C-alpha cells in the first residue's frame, strides 16, 4: 500500500532587525540605514534604538514596526487618544507636533528644490490646532450578536475589525457631543442588523447626520430618528439602497470669505475649517489678484476657491468633473450674487480642446487636483500661456511629477508652503506658485 506524502507547511518566521533611527520622514516613520539599505520604521523617532519586526522588504528599502525600545527619545510624547495604535485614523500622536510639521516641510522643500537651480522661497507653514480640527467623521456600525449591542467606531489599522469609540480627539466638539447620544439612540433601534454607517458633518447651521441602512425602515425607527434630530438640532439624512433623503432640517453650509457655500452631506469638502480658510486666503494673496484678471480654477468642486477669487477679478471660470458639483457651484454663485463666474463640467483626464471655456484667455490658473494629480490637464493647460499657476496639492509625489511638466513649459517655482491640514496623520498638503 502506497503512502501519500504530504509536506508539512513551513512555519513563517518573524524577521527582526535592530535599528538606530537617524531621521523622520513626512509620514511619521523613523528612517534608519542598515548595511546600505534604507528602513522605514513605524513608531520610531530620531535618536532611538529599536528592535523592530519586518513587515515588508524590497531590494532597496524595507518596512518594519518598532516592538522594543533599546534607547528611547526624550522627545517622545504620550498619545492622548485611548484608541491610538488600534484605530487607523492617526499615525503620529507619539511625535511632537512641531517635529511632525518640520518633517513634512522638509520633505516638501527638498523634493521641489531638486527640480531647479534657482532658489525657492519656503514660506511659513500654514498650521492650526493639533486637536478638534475635523468637521467630518464616518462611523462604522456593527451588530454584536454576542453582547446584543450595536458597536460604533472606526476600523482598526490594517483590518476590517471595529474599534468602538466614545470620542475622537481630532473631531470638532460638536461631533463629540453627539457620539454618546448616538450610542443611546442605536440601543433603541428595532432592526440593528440593518444599520450600515453614520456620517457626521459639523456645519455653520448645526451638525448634519447621514444614517445608512439596508432594507426597509420601520416606522418606529423613523420616529425615533426624527425625534433625535429634533431634540439635538441635527440636519438628518437617511440613505437606503437607492437614494439619500433629507428628512429633517436643512442642507448644510459653511461660510468662507463672507460667502455661504451649501453642500450635500456626501459632497467633498475640506474637513479642516480653519485651515481651509487660511489656505484660500494664501491662494488669493499669492495669485496677486486684481480687477483685470481672468482666472481659471480646475477641479473646483462647488466653488471653494472659485467664488472667493471671483470677487476680486474681472472673470472666473471653474471646471469640475462631477456634474452634480458643478450644479452646486452654480447655485452657490447665484445665492451669493456673484455674476462674473461660470462653471463647466469636464473630465480633466480627457481632451478638452473642444470645450468652449478652453478658447478663453486666462492669465492666471489655480488647480486643486485629487491625489492622482493633474498630469494630463497640465500638458494641455500650459498651452494657454497663463503667467502664473497656483497648485494646491494633497500628494507630494504627484506634485513633483506635475512640477516637472510645468518646468518643461517654462514655468519656475517661486514659492511653496506646507499646509498641516491633518495633524497626527501621514498626509502632506501644500501650496506652490509657478510663474512663467
From Swiss-Prot:
The active site is at 394 (nucleophile). GO terms for biological process: rRNA base methylation. Its EC number is 2.1.1.190. InterPro entries: 23S_rRNA_MeTrfase_RlmD (IPR001566), MeTrfase_TrmA_AS (IPR030390), NA-bd_OB-fold (IPR012340), SAM-dependent_MTases_sf (IPR029063), TRAM_dom (IPR002792), U5_MeTrfase_fam (IPR010280). Residues 10-68 form the TRAM domain. Gene3D superfamilies: 2.40.50.1070, Nucleic acid-binding proteins, Vaccinia Virus protein VP39. It catalyses: uridine(1939) in 23S rRNA + S-adenosyl-L-methionine = 5-methyluridine(1939) in 23S rRNA + S-adenosyl-L-homocysteine + H(+). One of its GO terms (molecular function) is rRNA (uridine-C5-)-methyltransferase activity. Keywords: 4Fe-4S, Iron, Iron-sulfur, Metal-binding, Methyltransferase, rRNA processing, S-adenosyl-L-methionine, Transferase. [4Fe-4S] cluster binds at residues 81, 87, 90, 168. PROSITE patterns: SAM_MT_RNA_M5U, TRAM, TRMA_1. S-adenosyl-L-methionine binds at residues 270, 299, 304, 320, 347, 368. Catalyzes the formation of 5-methyl-uridine at position 1939 (m5U1939) in 23S rRNA. Belongs to the class I-like SAM-binding methyltransferase superfamily. RNA M5U methyltransferase family. RlmD subfamily. PANTHER family: 23S RRNA (URACIL(1939)-C(5))-METHYLTRANSFERASE RLMD (PTHR11061:SF49), RNA M5U METHYLTRANSFERASE (PTHR11061). This is 23S rRNA (uracil(1939)-C(5))-methyltransferase RlmD. It comes from Haemophilus parainfluenzae (strain T3T1). The gene is rlmD.
Amino acid at each position: 500500500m502506497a503512502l501519500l506524502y504530504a509536506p508539512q507547511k513551513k512555519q513563517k518566521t518573524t524577521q527582526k532587525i535592530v535599528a538606530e533611527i537617524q531621521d523622520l520622514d513626512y509620514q511619521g516613520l523613523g528612517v534608519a540605514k542598515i548595511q546600505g539599505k534604507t528602513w522605514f520604521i513605524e513608531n520610531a523617532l530620531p535618536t532611538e534604538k529599536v528592535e523592530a519586526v519586518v513587515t515588508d522588504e524590497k531590494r532597496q528599502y524595507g518596512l518594519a514596526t518598532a516592538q522594543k525600545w533599546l534607547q528611547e527619545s526624550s522627545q517622545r510624547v504620550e498619545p492622548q487618544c485611548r484608541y491610538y495604535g488600534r484605530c487607523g485614523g492617526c499615525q503620529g500622536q507619539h511625535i511632537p507636533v512641531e517635529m511632525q510639521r518640520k518633517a513634512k516641510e522638509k520633505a516638501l522643500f527638498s523634493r521641489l528644490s531638486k527640480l531647479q537651480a534657482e532658489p525657492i522661497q519656503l514660506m511659513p507653514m500654514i498650521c492650526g490646532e493639533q486637536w478638534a480640527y475635523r468637521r467630518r467623521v464616518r462611523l462604522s456600525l456593527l451588530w454584536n450578536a454576542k453582547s446584543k449591542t450595536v458597536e460604533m467606531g472606526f476600523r482598526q489599522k490594517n483590518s476590517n475589525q471595529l474599534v468602538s469609540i466614545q470620542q475622537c480627539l481630532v473631531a470638532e466638539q460638536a461631533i463629540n457631543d453627539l457620539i454618546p447620544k448616538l450610542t443611546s439612540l442605536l440601543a433603541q433601534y428595532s432592526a440593528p442588523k440593518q444599520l450600515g454607517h453614520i456620517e457626521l458633518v459639523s456645519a455653520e447651521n448645526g451638525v448634519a447626520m447621514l444614517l445608512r441602512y439596508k432594507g426597509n425602515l420601520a416606522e418606529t425607527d423613523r420616529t425615533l430618528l426624527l425625534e433625535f434630530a429634533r431634540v439635538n438640532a441635527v440636519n438628518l439624512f437617511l440613505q437606503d439602497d437607492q437614494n439619500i433623503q433629507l428628512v429633517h432640517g436643512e442642507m448644510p453650509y459653511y461660510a468662507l470669505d463672507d460667502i455661504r457655500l451649501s453642500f450635500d452631506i456626501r459632497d467633498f469638502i475640506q474637513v479642516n475649517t480653519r485651515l481651509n480658510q487660511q489656505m484660500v486666503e494664501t491662494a488669493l494673496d499669492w495669485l496677486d489678484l486684481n480687477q483685470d484678471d481672468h482666472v481659471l480654477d480646475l477641479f473646483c468642486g462647488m466653488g471653494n476657491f472659485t467664488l472667493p477669487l471671483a470677487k476680486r477679478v474681472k472673470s472666473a471660470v471653474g471646471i469640475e468633473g462631477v456634474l452634480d458639483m458643478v450644479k452646486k457651484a452654480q447655485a452657490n454663485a447665484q445665492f451669493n450674487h456673484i455674476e462674473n463666474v461660470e462653471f463647466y463640467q469636464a473630465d480633466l483626464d480627457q481632451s478638452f480642446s473642444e470645450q468652449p471655456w478652453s478658447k478663453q484667455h486666462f492669465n492666471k490658473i489655480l488647480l486643486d487636483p485629487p491625489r492622482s494629480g493633474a498630469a494630463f490637464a497640465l500638458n494641455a493647460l500650459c498651452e494657454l500661456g497663463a503667467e502664473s499657476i497656483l497648485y494646491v496639492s494633497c500628494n507630494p509625489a504627484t506634485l513633483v511629477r506635475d512640477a516637472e511638466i510645468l518646468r518643461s513649459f517654462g514655468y519656475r517655482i517661486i514659492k511653496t508652503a506646507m499646509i498641516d491640514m491633518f495633524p497626527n496623520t501621514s498626509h502632506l498638503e501644500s501650496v506652490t506658485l509657478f510663474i512663467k
